[in-house]
């Protein structure tokens, strides 16, 4: 599904990523690992088409993402580590915004029950805890029809039940032929044989 081929990227004229290459098949899960500042978030942004590499190529389903970037980006769901929710909007309003781009998604109240957020559905997201904000951001996974998920530190600030909910959703997505690329400082609660790791 996704091929990253000899990718280079410089930050302030200094090499940050060099000769990055890997293949992520349909049904695959790749865990990007590396210390702070190693370029994990930057690599996700490159794959999402938000940054341009100095060298190298990114292929999605054997075609360069540059060929039709807009169509490619409709095939991916990117959840960054800063959540990307509007703090002035309620949970409901943030979800309605996302559903606008993914019509046919399940009901918002039903989604909120996944993380026991239904009683907060009309609260401004700026009043939520960091863990609750993360949960709202991750609800996009249930609203998305994208084949490729790019998740930057999706497990941060989650309680044990929320963590299990996300891992279950990732596994369901893979079973349907989707692919997941994620960063995390913590080990994944999965059998090591069930996913690949790439160290930056």
Swiss-Prot record:
Part of the ABC transporter complex CcmAB involved in the biogenesis of c-type cytochromes; once thought to export heme, this seems not to be the case, but its exact role is uncertain. Responsible for energy coupling to the transport system. Belongs to the ABC transporter superfamily. CcmA exporter (TC 3.A.1.107) family. Its EC number is 7.6.2.5. Residues 2-200 form the ABC transporter domain. It catalyses: heme b(in) + ATP + H2O = heme b(out) + ADP + phosphate + H(+). It is found in: Cell inner membrane. The complex is composed of two ATP-binding proteins (CcmA) and two transmembrane proteins (CcmB). Keywords: ATP-binding, Cell inner membrane, Cell membrane, Cytochrome c-type biogenesis, Membrane, Nucleotide-binding, Translocase, Transport. Its main location: membrane. It is an enzyme of class 7 (translocase). InterPro entries: AAA+_ATPase, ABC_transporter-like_ATP-bd, ABC_transptr_haem_export_CcmA, P-loop_NTPase. ATP binds at residues 34-41. It is a peripheral membrane protein. This is Cytochrome c biogenesis ATP-binding export protein CcmA. It comes from the Bacteria.
